[in-house]
C-alpha cells in the first residue's frame, strides 16, 4: 500500500475532521481519481507522434491510455471528425496513490524554475488542475528515448465540497502551494 494512502487513513482523516468539524468519516474529503490528459495536435500530420505520446503516457501512469478523437471537423486546425488528437488516463485506487506519491515527492521538485503550485487552480468544487510543460520531470521517462518535449494536464478530483476543503486535503499531502 502506498505511503500517502496510509497517511490519509492514519492522520489526514483525523486532522480534517477536527478542522472542519465532521461527525462522520464519510464526510471527510478524499481523492476520487487523478486524470492525466495529453493533447497531441501534431498527430494529425504524423501518426508516429501519437505512438510516442502513448508510450510516454503508459510509462508515467502505469496503465494504457485511451486515445481521444476529434468530435467535429475544424478546417482551421486541419482536423476531421474522428482524427486522434490526444490521449488520457484515469487513475483510481492503488495506482492513483502511487502516482500521487511520485508526483509530490519526485516530479514536482524536478520542474524547472518551480516556485510553488498556484492555489487559483481549484475549480470551486474542491478539484485541482495543474499543467506540466515537460514529461521528462517523471523518473519513468528516459531522456534519450523521447522524440519531443510534451506537456500534459493533471486533474485531481476530490469529494471536497469547496476549494477550502480541497486545499486542506492536498496541503495534508504536502502539496507545495505558493504562500
Curated annotation (Swiss-Prot):
Assembly with partners or alone: Part of the 50S ribosomal subunit; part of the 5S rRNA/L5/L18/L25 subcomplex. Contacts the 5S rRNA and the P site tRNA. Forms a bridge to the 30S subunit in the 70S ribosome.
PANTHER family registered for this protein in UniProt: 60S RIBOSOMAL PROTEIN L11-RELATED
Q: What name has this protein been given in UniProt?
A: Large ribosomal subunit protein uL5
Q: Which UniProt keywords apply?
A: Ribonucleoprotein, Ribosomal protein, RNA-binding, rRNA-binding, tRNA-binding
Supply the gene name.
rplE
User: Which SUPFAM superfamilies does this UniProt record tie to the protein?
Assistant: RL5-like
Query: What do the Gene Ontology cellular component annotations say?
Result: ribonucleoprotein complex; ribosome
Q: Family, per the entry? A: Belongs to the universal ribosomal protein uL5 family.
Instruction: Give the organism, scientific name.
Output: Shewanella loihica (strain ATCC BAA-1088 / PV-4)
Identify the NCBIfam families for this entry: PRK00010.1
Annotated function:
This is one of the proteins that bind and probably mediate the attachment of the 5S RNA into the large ribosomal subunit, where it forms part of the central protuberance. In the 70S ribosome it contacts protein S13 of the 30S subunit (bridge B1b), connecting the 2 subunits; this bridge is implicated in subunit movement. Contacts the P site tRNA; the 5S rRNA and some of its associated proteins might help stabilize positioning of ribosome-bound tRNAs.
Q: Which PROSITE patterns match?
A: RIBOSOMAL_L5
